């Protein structure tokens, strides 16, 4: 897409939001409590602040304010307001390709924010535990928040991720013509690295005429040892391993497709 010559500031708002899920099996009530405690410490407000601050540093954004909070009995939230320095729009790469990992990258944001909220949960029946992190990166300017997608998913390795990207509003060029998007995009998948795509099943639901893009991903490979908390597969009988595997797989399928499946 040819770069636009704008009249004034780029008024398009670009928002990327995604839910990251981690699934676990904890057999006893003590194990479930232990998982919640572990995940709450692993993703507390301080750790999340470090991740989001590194995101800002990686893309060259200036942090204006940080608000963070840990909650009782569990969960945390962090919101960072950021702004940009003057930048030449001609130097900004808006092509459709995977975003960077933490390397030498320059980008700028204005009137923008990055926020994350965490939701650990478990149920007393069945032994299933889930951890959900909701992340939103919203920018107003020439930069797409999709550039941060690749890094954030690498930082928060998870079983299932649902992503939504939307461009809102319009901006005018020097001739007064309104533009409702300023970069080419066919799929969020095109902003993900090859190694990440190799790990996940992927599905798109896009509404191109509304500039709304939705992608779901779920890990391809299932290894039971990665889903047991405070236990090993060798500690379980073959029947127990199969029952737990079926339970976890059903849970992941339901979250991925967003609907409850019948009990077989």
Curated annotation (Swiss-Prot):
Task: Please give the GO cellular component terms listed in this UniProt entry.
Answer: cytosol
Q: In which pathway does it act?
A: Amine and polyamine biosynthesis; S-adenosylmethioninamine biosynthesis; S-adenosylmethioninamine from S-adenosyl-L-methionine: step 1/1
Q: Where's the active site on this chain?
A: 112 (schiff-base intermediate with substrate), 117 (proton acceptor), 140 (proton donor)
Q: How is the cofactor bound?
A: Binds 1 pyruvoyl group covalently per subunit.
Alphabetically sorted, this entry's keywords are:
Autocatalytic cleavage, Decarboxylase, Lyase, Polyamine biosynthesis, Pyruvate, S-adenosyl-L-methionine, Schiff base, Spermidine biosynthesis, Zymogen
Q: Where is this site: Cleavage (non-hydrolytic)?
A: 111-112
Primary enzyme class: lyase
Give the Enzyme Commission number.
4.1.1.50
Give residue numbers for the modification (Pyruvic acid (Ser)): 112
InterPro entries named in the record: AdoMetDC_fam_prok, S-AdoMet_deCO2ase_bac, S-AdoMet_deCO2ase_core
A GO term (biological process) for this protein?
Answer: spermidine biosynthetic process
Q: Which NCBIfam families does this chain map to?
A: SAM_DCase_Eco
Role of this protein: Catalyzes the decarboxylation of S-adenosylmethionine to S-adenosylmethioninamine (dcAdoMet), the propylamine donor required for the synthesis of the polyamines spermine and spermidine from the diamine putrescine.
Which family is it part of? Belongs to the prokaryotic AdoMetDC family. Type 2 subfamily.
The protein's name in its UniProt record: S-adenosylmethionine decarboxylase proenzyme
Q: Which gene encodes it?
A: speD
